[in-house]
UniProtKB/Swiss-Prot annotation:
InterPro entries to which the protein is assigned, alphabetical: MetalloPept_cat_dom_sf, Pept_M54_archaemetzincn, Pept_M54_archaemetzncn_arc/bac
Residue positions binding Zn(2+) 2: C139, C144, C163, C166
Keywords: Hydrolase, Metal-binding, Metalloprotease, Protease, Zinc
Quaternary structure and partners: Monomer.
Protein name per UniProt: Archaemetzincin
Statement: the UniProt record of this protein carries the keyword Hydrolase: yes
Details of cofactor binding: Binds 2 Zn(2+) ions per subunit. One is catalytic, whereas the other seems to have a structural role.
Residues engaged in binding Zn(2+) 1: H128, H132, H138
Gene3D superfamilies: Collagenase (Catalytic Domain)
Matching Pfam families: Peptidase_M54
Length: 179
């Protein structure tokens, strides 16, 4: 049984259209329905000049609140309080999540651009953050998509799917997804 839920992808600033379309396709397969909303501007007040990064919590709070889950996708480098950077942030049991593509890009680490690598990394972090919205916390299974990623190596090591334990937690809440 698959629960049909709608995920709205919210571009925050200019975001690579190919990545947005890839996420839309995969979310449709996993969650049931997905749409891409019109782009919104990056809130300038979220920029921290001394760090040269944007505060993820401020961007997250700027996302629209709708009945559906909203996943913000941005190209800017983000951080959260007490952390040098984050790949994303979400409201636990909320409606909003955010990912940044900045540190998911191979070129951030001095490597050649690779769209396929970027797509799978974006998918992993997006499904991870949506997991938080659905009530999942970090998983100890390093292969589970809900594993905490402290570096890009951690992102690359984990799968894009929830482990059996995390799937069971979702099912216990009446959430059935196709993954």
């Amino acid at each position: 049984m698959v629960m049909i839920m709608r995920i709205c992808i919210q571009p925050v600033g200019d975001v690579n259209d190919e990545i947005l379309k890839f996420l839309k396709k995969k979310f449709g397969e996993v969650f049931g329905m997905c749409e891409i909303l019109p782009k919104i501007d990056i809130p300038i007040y979220a920029y921290n000049f001394s760090r040269g990064q944007f505060n993820s919590t401020l961007i997250l709070k700027s996302l629209p609140t709708v009945e559906d889950i909203v996943l913000g996708v941005t190209e800017v480098d983000i951080y959260a309080d007490n952390l040098n950077f984050v790949f994303g942030e979400a409201e636990l049991f909320g409606k909003r999540a955010l990912i940044s593509l900045a540190r998911l890009r191979p070129e951030f680490y001095g490597l050649p651009p690779n769209k396929d690598v970027l797509k799978i990394r974006a998918l992993k972090e997006a499904i991870h953050e949506i997991g938080h919205v659905l009530g999942l916390i970090h998983c100890e299974n390093k292969r589970c998509v809900m594993s905490f990623s402290n570096s890009i190596i951690d992102v690359d090591l984990k799968d894009w799917r929830y482990c059996k334990k995390c799937l069971k937690k979702l099912q216990d809440r009446g959430i059935y997804i196709s993954i």
